């Protein structure tokens, strides 16, 4: 599948699936499984960062470390912004209250596009990102 087809499938809501070891609820399809680093905001500062396996699905992003498994549904992420091609900042709600996290992963652009498609299709970064992804077949989203 080339980049243009992938972008169109994201717009249509029909995503390609990849094999994953994560047990997914019915109706959820894994799109990517990549390594990454997540930083959580606690109070006034950010933690040291934790290496995680990042699974992006049609409904959420799942972060799995050695000590925990966290699923963030698109409905729980209220705001997102790509800071770099591979760095995504998210703000949302967890079972313990409001939180923020930064996620560095090859799948940051895909994760952002899926979140935006579900929560904020008019996000100001979407048009330029889709245009750049369509023009650059070497983009991580096209792999």
Describe the role of every protein-language-model region:
Residues 14, 43, 59, 138-140:
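Generic, low-specificity signal for short hydrophobic/alpha-helical stretches with a mild N-terminal bias
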Residues 45-69:
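Conserved beta-hairpin
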Residues 1-53:
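Anionic N-terminal interaction surfaces
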Residues 21-22, 62, 78:
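Residue-level recognition of well-ordered secondary-structure positions
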